[in-house]
């Protein structure tokens, strides 16, 4: 679902922000 994809993308962005 779009909501799930958005949540997953937000999580990925958060992780990447911490890495870089």
Curated annotation (Swiss-Prot):
Organism superkingdom: Eukaryota
GO CC entries: extracellular region
GO MF, any single term: oxygen carrier activity
Keywords: Copper, Oxygen transport, Secreted, Transport
Tissue expr: Hemolymph.
Location in or out of the cell: Secreted, Extracellular space
Primary residence: secreted
Family the entry assigns: Belongs to the tyrosinase family. Hemocyanin subfamily.
Role played: Hemocyanins are copper-containing oxygen carriers occurring freely dissolved in the hemolymph of many mollusks and arthropods.
Designated name of the protein: Hemocyanin subunit 6
Organism expressing this protein natively: Homarus americanus (American lobster)
